[in-house]
């Protein structure tokens, strides 16, 4: 659910108009729409470079993952790892435009711990991988304002995987 929808539903649940504070928050959100779109376009257009930088960093931190018997030792396993990077980056862009963590939570995090555990993927590696993805993605953004729009959603994914 988008930030706008959530705000409206909360007010309607209380059978009231949006108050002044809510309207100001909505104004700020709507005024940030161009920046949000710019951030999403940057992340989308630079996806390959972001994933490449993030994976290099992850495999520096955990060289055993690409060593014999590691979770990303073969080309197929490595391709799946890179696919997951792209998947999380895309889901984070959904949350950026919505102004809400719900898209990444609902689509990307429900049941993720169980799934990775069942596949034998170390959760610490997933936490580190999203941290590397965050670092690579935020490095592509041009301003602190853009970073502030994207960073909370990366942090949300990291925190949820770390629990």
From Swiss-Prot:
Role: Allophycocyanin is a photosynthetic bile pigment-protein complex with maximum absorption at approximately 650 nanometers.
Protein name per its UniProtKB record: Allophycocyanin alpha-B chain
Gene3D superfamilies the record matches: Phycocyanins
PTM remark: Contains one covalently linked bilin chromophore.
Organism: Cyanidium caldarium (Red alga)
Keyword Nucleus: no
Superkingdom per UniProt: Eukaryota
SUPFAM superfamilies xrefs: Globin-like
InterPro entries: Globin-like_sf, Phycobilisome_asu/bsu, Phycobilisome_asu/bsu_sf
Highest classification ranks of the organism: Eukaryota, Rhodophyta, Bangiophyceae, Cyanidiales, Cyanidiaceae
Keywords: Antenna complex, Bile pigment, Chloroplast, Chromophore, Electron transport, Membrane, Methylation, Photosynthesis, Phycobilisome, Plastid, Thylakoid, Transport
GO process terms (BP): photosynthesis
Pfam family, one: Phycobilisome
Main location: plastid
Membrane topology: Peripheral membrane protein
Compartment(s) of residence: Plastid, Chloroplast thylakoid membrane
Residues the entry annotates as binding (2R,3E)-phycocyanobilin: 81
UniProt GO cellular component terms: chloroplast thylakoid membrane; phycobilisome
Family classification: Belongs to the phycobiliprotein family.
N4-methylasparagine PTM positions: 71
